[in-house]
Amino acid sequence: DADKAGDYNLSNIDLINHRGEAVDLKYVVVEMNIYESIYKNAVTGSIVITDAKNQIGRLEVQGLERIAFKLASPGITDAEDLLDASVETGEPFHVYKITDRKQVNQGLLVYTLHFASREFMRNLRTKVSQAYNGRLDMAVQKILRDEKYIDTRKRLKYEKTGNSDKIVI
């Protein structure tokens, strides 16, 4: 159970490169932020890392990396309240940017990795060009589920629309 507000369970934070090689960053992460907002279309986050072993150089970070972890509040057992970004059961986040890279002293590098959900990355790379006929909620579901478009595997929560429309996106 939680002793203090803000307590959390985080067993590991793996940075996985394009070859599938993973490095546990749990002990070199200074700060982790996760952002979710009704005003944004995806979950994003950042982690600040103190790197004394040149892990970023050894992994050959090139923009195809993923970050895998499971984050929960102590005492939480409901899967819906767990942020599962693991390789086995969830959907790892994708690294899209490295910022604030600083050489603090000889052998110690500090930098920030920015990451986002798989859907965020697919949305950046995918253009929808199609006509839809019917309820708009069905068109949105099709775009989100279709393998050619967003291809989300997440459970969707939506409200049915009452009218039928023709729309070209």
Outline where the language-model segments fall.
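Surface-exposed cap/loop segments at beta↔alpha junctions
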Residues: 55-168
